Amino acid sequence: MAEEHQNRLQNAVDSMVKSLERDNIRKMQGKMFRCSAQCCEDNGASMQQVHHCIERCHTPLAQAQSLVTTELERFQNRLSRCTMNCSDQAKDAFDSGSKEAQVKAQLEGCVIKCAEEHMNLIPSMTKKLKDALAQADK
């Protein structure tokens, strides 16, 4: 049961990342490559000037990718803290004499709750990332 919820959560995150890549990141990659190509077409520029030009072209994309990575890490850390809390509660219950089957059921219920709570965070995280990527693409 908990595994099913974990898979649903993973699929939702994967879907969000694919959507961000398709709708936002890919467009930024295209701009970056076109911008970089223009840098290379400047026959009057030195090698160093071309290099700096290409770096400037790459900056918005690098910032966008970093933003997505940071937000996903935050989400993962938050989920990990939630499941660690479940594990701690289960250990405490077991140490206080609860039966193993009861502790397993409590742990599973708690992990399912974590997954459901984090599923509910995905739409707002998606909106936040899409808004930030749209801003970075200006």
UniProtKB/Swiss-Prot annotation:
It comes from the Eukaryota. InterPro entries: DUF842_euk (IPR008560). Signal peptide: none annotated. Coiled coil: none annotated. It holds the Pfam family DUF842. One of its GO terms (cellular component) is cytoplasm. Belongs to the FAM136 family. This is Protein FAM136A. It comes from Xenopus laevis (African clawed frog). The lineage of its organism: Eukaryota, Metazoa, Chordata, Craniata, Vertebrata. The gene is fam136a.
